C-alpha cells in the first residue's frame, strides 16, 4: 500500500464507507515499517513546550496532568509514524476512498498513540473506535482510546499555543483560535 509515488486526490472532506478500514490498514503497515530516518520524539517536545507556556488555561493544565499520569505507558518509540495525520494531509478519491497521505516532514519513530490524536475530529468518536479496533487487530501492541483522548486534548492546547505565539498558520482561517477554543467545549463538554 505504501509506495512513495505521486498520487491524485483531494483533501479529506467526507470519508467514504471503506475509508476507516483503509486507514487502519495503511497505518498498521506504516507503523510496522522502517521508513523513518530518525526519532524526533515530537510528542514529548509538544508536552515540554506546553509545560513552559505561561498562558495555559485549566483545560491545558488538566490535559498535562492526565498526560503525566499515563506517561510511562507511552514510551513505545519504535513505530514509524507519519506524525501529522489530519484532514489536510489525508487524500481521498471522489468516492471518499483513501488515496494516500501527504506532508511527510514529521515522519519519525514514536508512540503510535500520537498518530491518532487528531483524526477523530473528522471521523468522530465512533469512527475512532472502529479505526482503533481494526488497527489493533493488525499490530503487536495496543492503542488505547483513553490515551488518544488525552493526546487530542494536548494537541488542541498545542494548536492554540503555536497560533498565539507565532500567529495564524498559512492554511488557517481567520477564526482558527476561536475554533480550537470551541473544540474544547464541544469535544470535552465536562470542561468549562
What does each of the following model-derived ranges do?
Residues 4, 20, 34-45, 134, ...:
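Inter-domain helical "communication" segments and dimerization helices
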Residues 31, 78-80, 148:
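Structured catalytic cores of enzymes that bind and process phosphorylated ligands/cofactors
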Residues 118-192:
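Helix-rich C-terminal or lid/interface subdomains of diverse kinases
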Residues 68-116:
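Active-site acidic catalytic loop and adjacent metal/ATP-binding pocket
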Residues 10, 30-38, 71, 139, ...:
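A general structural signal marking secondary-structure boundaries and capping sites
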Residues 2, 25, 36-75, 79:
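Active-site catalytic-loop/activation-segment of kinase and kinase-like phosphoryl-transfer enzymes
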Residues 19-22, 84, 112, 149, ...:
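An acidic site on a long C-lobe helix of protein kinase domains
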Residues 1-38:
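ATP-binding pocket architecture of kinase catalytic cores
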